[in-house]
């Protein structure tokens, strides 16, 4: 016996049956974001921390959403941000100008984009205190040690400090060197780039927080009266004397940097907080000649890597995004200052080009990465250029959403009118991973360049 056919088109609800809610009817309030929920039960002990939270907390929450993290991870990372980074941002409004961002803000958010991959959120961070820049701590030494000690007490994934500690010992000013620079008339205002170290935090989808360290050798070289390149080469030699895992690739970098006068006050290094056998070493540089010819030269180490298929394939893709961004070519007037309000000098707006050479243990040659300067470029144009490039790579999950994602990150701004929400576009390429890109952002809610 078969069941009678149910015809849905003949079903009629009784006249007095309750109706489905219409779109116009009021909805239940949405759940609070992790930032809102945690802040409801947290008392910030100082007005400065509360103000920094207002400037960065909700924005960080939106970046977590843009990174497509699960709700448990959002709460976990927000808790870390609230309890360990907010207290280390120092006084508000800021007094210390950090080297890590174009505005001098001591915090910088970035999102990493790869094919078919979760967007990875990162934070660049220089801890600051009320003493930073004062006569007691003119070059911000104390907060670096304080945050390092604080992180060491947490249960962070694969957290290992000896490699970073070695770099710090080689490049951080001693107290006698601080006094020496002050006597020479080279106090904290003698050069705008006065940071000595900083941290980076990668927020992994599985909930792990990976830590990186950055060191800036220029002040040490100045105090010791030795060239920056000499100081760096000696530090790498001593740290690699037992394992010999960076020697060959670093030799290629050092030769090129010496012949091209690539070492300067903007050169710095970074490492991971992992065991030395798994360590990567990165050498960063900056150049005011923002031209395709210079980019191609630096990408190939002055022709030293011209025979490597991986390098040439990556350069071809780099030319694509360079052309789409339409960054004005030429020599930049940048002299190391900051662009932090609408009255900034014209020569502080345009940024230099930044690059790094990443050395993996035992590698034959370094992996180049370039940071294309888009600070000062129209934000919507940059977003559309990225979307077009990602579409050409077959990344629809990023290409289709990015302009809208950027607008959602900054709901109070019109991205067709702003020019400083995106600061850098980083690009690297390997045969195994393909194109690997990140976007670095203005990282506080206030848009510092608002017109009256």
UniProtKB/Swiss-Prot annotation:
Temperature-activity profile? Optimum temperature is 4 to 42 degrees Celsius.
To what use is this protein put? Notoamides have been shown to exhibit antitumoral activities. Notoamides A-C show moderate cytotoxicity against HeLa and L1210 cells with IC(50) values in the range of 22-52 mg/ml, but the IC(50) value of notoamide D is greater than 100 mg/ml. Moreover, notoamide C induces G2/M-cell cycle arrest at a concentration of 6.3 mg/ml.
An MF annotation (GO) of this entry: prenyltransferase activity
Q: What's the effect of swapping residue 424 to Y?
A: Retains about 25% catalyticactivity
Q: Site positions for Required for regioselectivity, renumbered to this chain?
A: 124
The entry's dimethylallyl diphosphate-binding residues are 122, 212, 214, 282, 284, 371, 436, 440
What the record says about activity regulation is: Addition of 5 mM Mg(2+), Ca(2+) or Mn(2+) slightly enhances catalysis (about 100-120%). Significant reduction of enzyme activity (2%-35%) is observed with Cu(2+), Zn(2+), Fe(2+), or Sn(2+) (5 mM).
**Pfam families registered for this protein in UniProt:** Trp_DMAT
Q: What is the effect of changing residue 122 to G/H?
A: Leads to less than 2% catalytic activity
Residue ranges under compositional bias (Basic and acidic residues)? 1-19
What pH dependence is recorded for this entry? Optimum pH is 6-9.
UniProt keywords (A-Z) are: Alkaloid metabolism, Prenyltransferase, Transferase
What is known about its subunit structure?
Monomer.
| The protein, known as | Deoxybrevianamide E synthase notF
Q: Tell me the organism.
A: Aspergillus sp. (strain MF297-2)
**Lineage of source species:** Eukaryota, Fungi, Dikarya, Ascomycota, Pezizomycotina
Gene name?
notF
């Amino acid at each position: 016996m078969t069941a009678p056919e149910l015809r849905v088109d003949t079903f009629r609800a009784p006249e007095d049956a309750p109706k489905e809610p219409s779109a116009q009817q009021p909805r239940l309030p949405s759940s609070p974001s992790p930032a809102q929920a945690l802040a409801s039960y947290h008392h910030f002990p100082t007005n400065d921390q509360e103000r920094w939270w207002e400037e960065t907390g909700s924005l960080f929450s939106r970046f977590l959403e843009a990174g497509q993290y699960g709700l448990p991870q959002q709460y976990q990372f927000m808790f870390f941000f609230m309890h360990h980074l907010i207290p280390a941002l120092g006084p508000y409004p800021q007094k210390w100008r950090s080297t890590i961002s174009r505005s001098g803000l001591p915090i910088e958010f970035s999102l990493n984009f790869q094919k078919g991959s979760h967007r990875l959120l990162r934070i660049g961070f220089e801890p600051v205190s009320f003493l930073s820049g004062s006569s007691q701590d003119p070059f911000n030494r104390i907060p670096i040690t304080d945050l390092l000690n604080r992180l060491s007490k947490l249960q962070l994934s694969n957290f290992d400090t000896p490699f970073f500690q070695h770099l710090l010992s080689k490049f951080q000013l001693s107290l006698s060197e601080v006094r020496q620079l002050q006597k020479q008339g080279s106090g904290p205002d003698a050069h705008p780039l006065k940071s000595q170290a900083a941290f980076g935090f990668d927020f992994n989808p599985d909930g792990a927080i990976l830590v990186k360290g950055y060191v800036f050798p220029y002040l040490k070289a100045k105090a010791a009266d030795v060239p920056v390149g000499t100081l760096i080469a000696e530090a790498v030699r001593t740290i690699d004397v037992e394992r010999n895992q960076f020697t060959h690739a670093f030799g290629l970098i050092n030769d090129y940097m010496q012949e091209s006068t690539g070492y300067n006050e903007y050169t710095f290094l970074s490492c991971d907080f992992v065991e030395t056998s798994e360590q990567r070493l990165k050498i960063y540089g900056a150049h005011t000649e923002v031209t395709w010819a210079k980019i191609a030269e630096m990408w190939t180490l002055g022709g030293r890597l011209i025979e490597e298929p991986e390098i040439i394939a990556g350069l071809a893709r780099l030319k694509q995004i360079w052309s789409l961004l339409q960054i004005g070519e030429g020599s930049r007037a940048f002299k190391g200052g900051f662009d932090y309000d609408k009255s900034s000098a014209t020569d502080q707006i345009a940024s230099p080009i930044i690059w790094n050479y990443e050395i993996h243990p035992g590698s034959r040659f370094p992996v180049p990465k370039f940071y294309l300067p888009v600070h000062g470029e129209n934000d919507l144009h940059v977003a559309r250029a990225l979307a077009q490039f990602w579409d050409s790579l077959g990344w629809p999950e990023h290409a289709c959403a990015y302009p809208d994602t950027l607008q959602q990150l900054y709901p109070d701004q019109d991205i067709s009118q702003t020019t400083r929400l995106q600061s850098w576009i980083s690009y690297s390429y390997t045969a195994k991973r393909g194109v690997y890109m990140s976007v670095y952002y203005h990282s506080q809610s206030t848009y510092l360049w608002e017109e009256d």
